[in-house]
């Protein structure tokens, strides 16, 4: 939520922008609430939005995109903190291999995955920087 929060920060008044913030538990539910008129807006990542266009077109048709945030790395693949380095390296290699395997092209297309690269924590610095900027602008918490 750091990129949307940073985009909203200049518009917030005394640290507030929304009358209420609702946590729905999923992007699909957030979009459904916007479509139903029980929420004014929601932040939906572009991959999830594309999947919802494909699988819930009637819901998406009752919404429209207001704005896009700045660019940031896509959502990461994650594993448990306790996963040892050797296993994590094997998992990373398998993901990158699957992302390039021609036999899996149809599956990747179904998930809107163009590929995968090994990311480092520094690759996500833009997300942390957006959080810092939002805090500096007085919008430290989404509200």
Show the residue positions of the predicted features:
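An extracytoplasmic/periplasmic, membrane-proximal ligand-sensing/linker region
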Residues: 72, 79, 85-143
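Short beta-strand->loop
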Residues: 19-20, 53-71
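Hydrophobic residues within well-ordered alpha-helices
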Residues: 34-35, 77
